[in-house]
Amino acid sequence: MIKTPSLVSLLHPACLSGKLRVRSACLDDWANIEMLYQHARRRTPRLWWWEEYLHHPLFLVVEQRDTLVGALFAWADESPVAWVRLAVLADSLPLDRWFDAVLPVLIDRGQRFQGSQTLAWMDYDDWAADALHQRGFLRWEEVITLEVTLPHKDVESTSDVMFRPATHADLDALVAIDHAAFLPHWWQSSQTMARRLAASAYFSVACEKGTQQVVAYIEGGRQGDTRAHINRIAVHPDWQGFGIGARLMRSALITFHQSGVRTVSLNTQRSNRRAQRLYHQLGFRPTGDTTTVWTLDL
């Protein structure tokens, strides 16, 4: 049985000497991973439902002297790109030792079990940057955060579409739009889309008036009483350039404002100048928060 780590064991260097052992996670590891996550400084944000994948071969834990001192989980969401969904290690465990122990196992299993072609890492706080670079990862993109204080600026548009709330029947169309509008790095599966549809405070689609074809969507959620975040906006390439994105954004901002939201944020790639121009027109401004995306071709 794996020992439950105390806060002392997670922080004291003397407790972190010895050989590292990498194995597949199991359901019984949840409490130990959770305790480690609560106390560790080097960790990725909680943006994925990693607890549900503890049985999967791509969820790895690292042990030292029968104590769980690290975890690494990657998942390709019906995409050739596997994203690191959880990375956490004890504060006194050298980063290079952890990487050298667990990364080769993760890469091997990603290729064997999911056919992954690329491993991607969103490096919040830059704690892994040097180690990633030393292991062949390349800086692929920067994600920047923008926000607007409501009410927003209006934007003219002439698109011949109508809007309605998204439903479960739209899932296939939503996934198709995702795959057409984004690079594989950003694809979402129908399962992920269904989760967002069930959980999001705001999920709207744009439909062509004649055929009722779904051509775009926007999805966002509340962050407390007065803040909201736009998680995703996508317009099918065949329908880009007609102001649909502007109308989707405007409708979402109005709805959030009417529900008491005062500030709305979103993320976008630094290279996506077209999207940034639209957001700027709507009153969004950069917050200064930047996250580097690292990728490794497998």
Language-model features: locations:
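Active-site rim helix/loop that mediates acceptor-substrate recognition in acyltransferases
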Residues: 12-13, 37-65, 73, 182-210, ...
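Conserved donor-binding loop and adjoining core beta-sheet/short helix segment
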Residues: 47-103, 218-228
